């Protein structure tokens, strides 16, 4: 229920009532799970976000996209929804009577730690807070997550730019590794 928790009640709560409301709406046991997950996830997520930021700022990301594009004739970019995880999501979205699960404290902690790590990174790098709030928080909870909830991550990603499509594939594995190996 991780994806459902993020694209459903977590995003809706942030959109409606702000970031702190996610934590405040949890019961005591879920608050403990949130705190544990948040503290365990913040620095591993921040490490990846720093790497992404540096890759973009240095021009390495652009070079990587150009190089990957040059390989497309031999190694075309495939769809990202071919694994069991994505197939389950397709079945869940097909159920029109589905109800959103309640906020999962652990999921919320990891998600919020990653979001706040991004906010802190962009603040540290001198971005104006209005830009950070709009492009890191509002766009996620009011645009990307609802769209992903409706159509799935593959549809959302694979209808983006080549840069976004490659980035999703490149960085997802790094997030997965860091969060699994360093957080838990």
Question: Where are the regions that the model predicts?
Answer:
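NAD(P)-dependent Rossmann-like dehydrogenase/reductase catalytic/cofactor-binding core
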Residues: 6-99, 106-184
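Rossmann-fold NAD(P) dinucleotide-binding segment
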Residues: 1
């Amino acid at each position: 229920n991780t994806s459902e928790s993020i694209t459903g009640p977590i995003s809706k709560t942030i959109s409606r009532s702000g970031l702190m409301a996610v934590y405040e709406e949890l019961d005591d046991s879920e608050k403990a799970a949130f705190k544990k997950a948040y503290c365990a996830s913040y620095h591993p997520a921040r490490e990846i976000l720093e790497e992404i930021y540096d890759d973009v700022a240095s021009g390495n990301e652009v070079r990587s996209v150009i190089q990957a594009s040059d390989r497309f004739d031999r190694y075309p970019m495939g769809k990202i929804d071919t694994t069991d995880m994505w197939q389950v999501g397709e079945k869940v979205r097909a159920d029109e009577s589905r109800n959103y699960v309640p906020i999962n404290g652990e999921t919320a902690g990891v998600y919020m730690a990653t979001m706040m790590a991004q906010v802190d990174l962009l603040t540290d790098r001198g971005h104006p807070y209005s830009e950070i709030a709009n492009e890191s928080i509002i766009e996620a909870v009011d645009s990307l997550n609802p769209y992903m909830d409706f159509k799935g991550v593959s549809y959302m990603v694979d209808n983006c730019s080549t840069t976004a499509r490659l980035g999703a594939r490149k960085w997802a594995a790094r997030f997965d590794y860091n969060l699994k190996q360093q957080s838990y």
